[in-house]
Amino acid sequence: QRQMCIRDRSDVAIHTAKNHANKENIDINYILGEAENLLPEKNEHFDVVTCLEAIEHVPDPNQLVKTCSNLCKKNGDIFFSTINRNPKSFLFAIVGAEYILNLLPKGTHEYEKFIKPSELIQMMENNGLTIKELTGMSYNPLTKNYWLGKNVDVNYLIHAKKI
């Protein structure tokens, strides 16, 4: 039997997610804490590992990639999403989202921690992952619509397979 397990460092995020899951009657195992704390008992345990909008907030992104790779089974899928590091991403993700539109609390992001796709791809490949797809994610704050596309200037998603 397959089970969904979600681990997060934020008790607020887990509480919010639990409320959403309960409304949808979805059975999810929520765990508060660091992904690294799942090792070694969950080594190569998961079919799919996602690390969404988190890697730009940790002190050692490469260590997080390594942990995610270690948690994933052979031939499993891994997804990372994060923010590119360039002037456009600074303008959109920090100035726009945090200071003009107030979509996020001020200080949520540090520009220096943004990661270029080439940097994340290198970390992933160094940890036994084969890149399958790089996709851009865009958001229109006026229409509140999200979409996927080729533009990776600001937000992007990478899918990889564990060798």
Spans of model-derived segments:
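Short alpha-helix
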Residues: 111-134
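Conserved SAM-binding strand-loop segment of SAM-dependent methyltransferases
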Residues: 23-40
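Conserved class I S-adenosyl-L-methionine
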Residues: 77-102
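A short glycine-rich, Lys/Arg-flanked "PGG" loop and its adjoining helix->strand segment in the class I
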Residues: 62-77
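Conserved SAM/SAH-binding beta-strand->alpha-helix loop
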Residues: 10-12
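Acceptor-substrate binding/catalytic loop of class I
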Residues: 82, 101-119
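A conserved beta-strand element that flanks and buttresses the S-adenosyl-L-methionine
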Residues: 50
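Short, small-residue-biased leader/transition segments that mark boundaries at the very start
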Residues: 1-6
